[in-house]
Amino acid sequence: MTPADLATLIKETAVEVLTSRELDTSVLPEQVVVERPRNPEHGDYATNIALQVAKKVGQNPRDLATWLAEALAADDAIDSAEIAGPGFLNIRLAAAAQGEIVAKILAQGETFGNSDHLSHLDVNLEFVSANPTGPIHLGGTRWAAVGDSLGRVLEASGAKVTREYYFNDHGRQIDRFALSLLAAAKGEPTPEDGYGGEYIKEIAEAIVEKHPEALALEPAATQELFRAEGVEMMFEHIKSSLHEFGTDFDVYYHENSLFESGAVDKAVQVLKDNGNLYENEGAWWLRSTEFGDDKDRVVIKSDGDAAYIAGDIAYVADKFSRGHNLNIYMLGADHHGYIARLKAAAAALGYKPEGVEVLIGQMVNLLRDGKAVRMSKRAGTVVTLDDLVEAIGIDAARYSLIRSSVDSSLDIDLGLWESQSSDNPVYYVQYGHARLCSIARKAETLGVTEEGADLSLLTHDREGDLIRTLGEFPAVVKAAADLREPHRIARYAEELAGTFHRFYDSCHILPKADEDTAPIHSARLALAAATRQTLANALHLVGVSAPEKM
């Protein structure tokens, strides 16, 4: 019985108790909260349901708790239900009910933890979207890891997810990139506000090798050639780096297509027609303050050029027109102002503003021996995705970026993540999985199997701790999806690995050399198999491998 199963049982029991006393059942919460007590001696789980509803039905909380305890204790799944304090209920599961969690995991396998509670969502998840003017820096790398994990978590919760990369190929930064490449090809210094780094020289040389005539063309044609080829080569490098990192996208959306297709003009006309765009001093302004923004925004400047927000508005419209009812933008730390303006754009176009969510990620700092690592071999000024992977590997890089909430800045100590010790979180979790695989191999050699195991034998305190931790996984996945916080999965994996290691140190899973195989060995092997499956499921959700040997 998982915490969710117990919550359902408590709710059903509460309905029966209130109904039998002709009390109002509508006051019961939609979901009963079930938590593990801080002191394990108080029981397996606790709930404050009696305190929540007693006053609403005109009853003393302890009296209501007493009625609930008596009714729950009559259920075969409950070993005991005791009242604490003003009306808390401390519940201890029967051994067989605890064992049901193990059986459930083994039956569900790779789908344990999944649900369909977000099946009503068609999500457009846009992340990374780095400009094609250089390699992906650490901020973009954080989104590459977190965004991919969030997509996995949302899909595990039943949502349809489209992973999208917004390709910024429209704007002055592309012109500066092209001029930087051209200067490098000519052997000239990097232009002011240009891009430097070894990668600029490499791309420039590749363009000249591919087009020997490039520098002999008319100046405008030369610049356009370096622009088009440079952007394409840089973007191919970005896609290759992301793929190696384990992050792929369903859609690569070109910003320039919004202007070339007329989508920007169409969106502007919609806003003019519905009165949400007004003219002032030759410019056209969005009435964004009417939709929660702190100021109205210029959409078309007085010289007739579109402001940057014009593309954002057209892009919002395009996402909704493709059938997405939730559009998640994962943006950098300097994009807080985008939250209100994107929601305002959606509302002004006639869409629900809650269909737009903006997640803001904070900075990432790389450290070695307590000192900042600032320089990249190829990029020249910033540390890149490739640098991080080269330093600590893909699994450690992804895990280090995912395990912390994105709304806080992150320091990554390279020495810690390079180490093969329990201090390294990803090593600790992966070692737990590898140890479990080793146990399974040894069990096969000894002829021990979990088939037909009597799971009611799992009564040791460490067994109970492990079973209860396993039972929490579905709720952790649900919370990670609902709150858009995949770091919860990584932290759970660490907790599960730690609980398993403590169980392993206290309980012999397989018979020793002088022992015969006993029913408890099969039961513990089943518990180990369930733990292995759950760890593998958690690692999959963060996009990290689950090694069988280490």
Swiss-Prot record:
One of its GO terms (molecular function) is ATP binding. GO terms for cellular component: cytoplasm. InterPro entries: aa-tRNA-synth_I_CS, Arg-tRNA-ligase, Arg-tRNA-synth_N, Arg-tRNA-synth_N_sf, ArgRS_core, DALR_anticod-bd, Rossmann-like_a/b/a_fold, tRNAsynth_Ia_anticodon-bd. It is found in: Cytoplasm. A motif ('HIGH' region) lies at residues 130-140. It catalyses: tRNA(Arg) + L-arginine + ATP = L-arginyl-tRNA(Arg) + AMP + diphosphate. This is Arginine--tRNA ligase. The lineage of its organism: Bacteria, Bacillati, Actinomycetota, Actinomycetes, Mycobacteriales.
